[in-house]
Amino acid sequence: MYAIIETGGKQYKVSEGDTIAVEKLSVKQGEQIVFERILHLSTDGTVKIGQPYVEGCTVKGTVLSHERARKVVVVKYRPRKNYRRERGHRQWFSLVKIDKIEIEKTS
């Protein structure tokens, strides 16, 4: 079973037990988070595709930590003018462990 979720403007393919790095979430370390924007759900041969989201399905996870990515260095340079500038940036991200993919039973 897997699902494709949307968070932070990006899409992630997740299964139960996966650990993913997503854009920084405003949830404390160790707390539960519920993803409700499910774009695609595949279970035992059946596939549900959302228009735009799958109804009655949630993905639950636990925030493991908040970390910073490797530094991205941006260089500005003008030839023959002795002009050089170097700036660095480290983006925050959250590590999330996917605990459960829940599907609401419909009768």
UniProtKB/Swiss-Prot annotation:
Domain of life: Bacteria
Entry annotated with the keyword Ribosomal protein: yes
GO molecular function: rRNA binding; structural constituent of ribosome
Cystine pairs: none
Keywords: Ribonucleoprotein, Ribosomal protein, RNA-binding, rRNA-binding
Pfam families xref list: Ribosomal_L21p
GO biological process entries: translation
GO CC annotation, single: ribonucleoprotein complex
Described function: This protein binds to 23S rRNA in the presence of protein L20.
Family: Belongs to the bacterial ribosomal protein bL21 family.
PANTHER family according to UniProt: 50S RIBOSOMAL PROTEIN L21, LARGE RIBOSOMAL SUBUNIT PROTEIN BL21M
Subunit: Part of the 50S ribosomal subunit. Contacts protein L20.
Protein name: Large ribosomal subunit protein bL21
Origin species: Pseudothermotoga lettingae (strain ATCC BAA-301 / DSM 14385 / NBRC 107922 / TMO)
Upper taxonomic lineage: Bacteria, Thermotogati, Thermotogota, Thermotogae, Thermotogales
The gene coding this protein: rplU
